[in-house]
Amino acid sequence: TGAISSFSKGEETSWADKDHQISAFMYRSHSFEEACQYGHTYNYNHGGEYPYKTPLGCQDSGLNTTGARSKRWYYSIHQIYRRDDHSSIVLNLNPPSELISLGYGAPASVYITLTAMEASMAIDLTWEGKRAVFLPESSWFEFTPKLQGDLSNRWVLSVDKMGKENIDTSDVVAKAGAVLHGLDPVYGGMTFRSGSEPSQAFRVESLDAGLMSPGYVRNTWNFEAYDGSPARPQDGAAFNLHSNLYTTNYVVYYPWIQEDSTSRFRFIIRADS
């Protein structure tokens, strides 16, 4: 998949293994039912004034005949490049052939550049050949670090929002949308921090992607998803790179212009033990 399965700082702390991978690109195809769910949940009805919006909240009932289905897709490594000084490697990822045959608009290629720095790692994700389609889709960059200790060693997953840092993603009132968080546009990000050892932390800063989703749920239209049970840091989190699921005067074809068929997202990983 191109994800990192070994990441350590020092001899004592390992942040990744085969069951806890970081920096995994995931393309998600959505079913017709999922495409309709946002409209049902948002419950917005302007009386049918505009023909593209039905009272049921579905963008287009004709999608039901497309065979659209819900699935998480992971790319595979096609080629690996390395700088002569060994400071960076570039992973060239290709999509599954089955995904392409379904007619979704997944990027034709994804490049992930990993660059080691003195106290951090820079990650550059670039995709090429993104096709504009009406089929419901979303793209994610997932991080599921290995959190040391059992569940009694409480970990906190926090985010940086505009004007305030380190907001606990589990401390959200009911019906407030705990499933999706906006980030501060200036070096905002997310941090996994040990409750018993606050100096032990894994942080990912996002320079371009402004939305993150905690836990395993990626149904971002279900703003009540964590009302009964908050997201668990052990389940990781992901940055939302793009989505066309919204029916609130939001662009449903992406890319809207051909120049955006190539997109770039930058991240910085910092780990403290």
Segments (PLM) and residue ranges:
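C-terminal (or distal) subdomains of carbohydrate-active enzymes
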Residues: T1-S273
